């Protein structure tokens, strides 16, 4: 994945800078999301690495996307096809999404808990993270009963493991060392 990110980063950055300049971040996010889905389609995948020329591949890809992609988006597709990089479109979309969140001072946080969190608990976690990260936080909550109790919060590079299973694992490691 690191290699895909390295390849995708210049395309994502160029698309993001252009979207900022044209005040079209949301529409570009939608376009890239759609293009990424097309590139991951089981019918499309073999064509991306097939025997088509770059211009044929770009034309086919643009035709499949139809009106979902504007002229500038089509230009990005053509450049990526010329460089044989259409298969990294999902990574381009992910990086674009990260750039967009960074620009908007937002972060997505994953909260895994042993039991379902109440709205009040989610609000408390969100407020604490917003204070700590100085960003607006969007929570993605899920339940994993194997945690026994507590939560694991992941926001970017930050990981807070407040689960009983995590504490037991850390205690076990200390006892073994």
From Swiss-Prot:
Q: Name one GO cellular component term.
A: plasma membrane
Judging by the UniProt lineage, the source's domain of life is Bacteria
The membrane topology of this protein is: Peripheral membrane protein
Asked whether the keyword Cell inner membrane is assigned, the reply is yes
Q: Which residues form the signal peptide?
A: none
Q: Where in the cell is it found?
A: Cell inner membrane
Q: Looking at the keywords, is Membrane present?
A: yes
Q: What does this protein do?
A: F(1)F(0) ATP synthase produces ATP from ADP in the presence of a proton or sodium gradient. F-type ATPases consist of two structural domains, F(1) containing the extramembraneous catalytic core and F(0) containing the membrane proton channel, linked together by a central stalk and a peripheral stalk. During catalysis, ATP synthesis in the catalytic domain of F(1) is coupled via a rotary mechanism of the central stalk subunits to proton translocation.
Name the family the entry cites: Belongs to the ATPase delta chain family.
Q: How does it assemble?
A: F-type ATPases have 2 components, F(1) - the catalytic core - and F(0) - the membrane proton channel. F(1) has five subunits: alpha(3), beta(3), gamma(1), delta(1), epsilon(1). F(0) has three main subunits: a(1), b(2) and c(10-14). The alpha and beta chains form an alternating ring which encloses part of the gamma chain. F(1) is attached to F(0) by a central stalk formed by the gamma and epsilon chains, while a peripheral stalk is formed by the delta and b chains.
Query: What's the name of the protein?
Result: ATP synthase subunit delta
Q: Which organism is it from?
A: Shewanella loihica (strain ATCC BAA-1088 / PV-4)
Name the gene behind this protein: atpH
